[in-house]
From Swiss-Prot:
It catalyses: 1-(5-phospho-beta-D-ribosyl)-5-[(5-phospho-beta-D-ribosylamino)methylideneamino]imidazole-4-carboxamide = 5-[(5-phospho-1-deoxy-D-ribulos-1-ylimino)methylamino]-1-(5-phospho-beta-D-ribosyl)imidazole-4-carboxamide. Keywords: Amino-acid biosynthesis, Cytoplasm, Histidine biosynthesis, Isomerase. This is 1-(5-phosphoribosyl)-5-[(5-phosphoribosylamino)methylideneamino] imidazole-4-carboxamide isomerase. It is found in: Cytoplasm. GO terms for molecular function: 1-(5-phosphoribosyl)-5-[(5-phosphoribosylamino)methylideneamino]imidazole-4-carboxamide isomerase activity. Pathway: Amino-acid biosynthesis; L-histidine biosynthesis; L-histidine from 5-phospho-alpha-D-ribose 1-diphosphate: step 4/9. The active site is at D8 (proton acceptor), D130 (proton donor). The gene is hisA. The keyword Isomerase applies.
């Protein structure tokens, strides 16, 4: 199972939210690029980057910050948050982003998904479904969809979408364990490749998710647990917190473009 570290950007800084609540945010670093380097040096094979400001406003506020991350790293970077037009997707792919995550627009403008898949590879276009009690939430989790999460997935599947990033909002940032049952239910009904997200707290959660590989769950996005050093071998992050700094010399081979999509 591929483990994908998450970097959320708000006001140009690397932050983490609790259950998507913008009033409950913690700033970890002023420069998201430094955070990206840390995760790369800890052997990340891919990064998940979200522009939180764009998720609310629909404007690519942190585009330059994301460009810096992509230009610095030698691994695939997927980007989400406020991507609501064909031009947004072109712009991100144009700077080397490996794949873009369409969230709200999949609900409000499904025709956009069809247009994107007519132009780009399904490996470059994925749909993010962030659900609470089985109901997708959109526009920075401030509005609800009228359909069930798996129903949305099946509609996307008809359009040619191959992968869903599924987030259990009730677990996101809570450090209370992964939403195993909700993810299992969704994956079984959707019948697609699924990247799980939300609530991973320990290696035990990762082991539980591995049992869902038979249903298409082949990767997981991990956020706050990494920032709170809940996993072993996180010496680099510890060193950075202590002011010891980092460098940009990667000790592992480049895997840009080689990640399994």
């Amino acid at each position: 199972m591929l483990i994908i570290p998450a970097i959320d950007i708000k006001d140009g800084k690397c932050v983490r939210l609790t259950r998507g609540d913008f009033d409950q945010q913690k700033i970890y670093l002023d420069n998201p690029r430094d955070m990206a380097i840390i995760w790369r040096k800890q052997n990340a094979k891919m990064l998940h980057v979200v522009d939180l400001d764009a998720a609310l406003t629909g404007t690519m506020v942190n585009f330059e910050k994301i460009r810096e991350i992509v230009a610095t790293l030698d691994i695939p970077v997927q980007v989400g948050g406020g991507i609501r037009s064909f031009e947004d997707v072109e712009r991100y792919l144009g700077i080397g982003v490996s794949r873009v995550v369409i969230g709200s627009a999949a609900v409000t403008n499904p025709q956009l998904i069809a247009e994107l898949l007519a132009t780009f590879s399904p490996s470059q276009i994925v749909v993010g479904i962030d659900a609470e009690n089985g109901i997708p939430k959109i526009k920075g989790w401030t509005e609800s969809s009228s359909m069930q999460d798996y129903e949305l997935a099946l509609e996307m599947k008809k359009l040619g979408v191959k992968r869903i990033i599924y987030t259990d909002i009730s677990r996101d940032g809570m450090m209370q364990g992964v939403g195993y049952e909700s993810t299992r239910r969704f994956a079984m009904k959707a019948g697609m490749r699924v990247t799980a997200s939300g609530g991973v707290t320990s290696s035990d959660d990762l082991k539980k998710l591995q049992t869902l590989e038979q249903y298409g769950v082949d990767s997981v996005i991990v956020g706050k647990a990494l920032y709170e050093s809940n996993f072993p071998c996180q010496q680099l992050w510890y060193n950075y917190e202590k002011g010891m700094g980092i460098d940009c010399n990667f000790t592992t081979a480049s895997v840009r473009g080689k990640c399994c999509f």
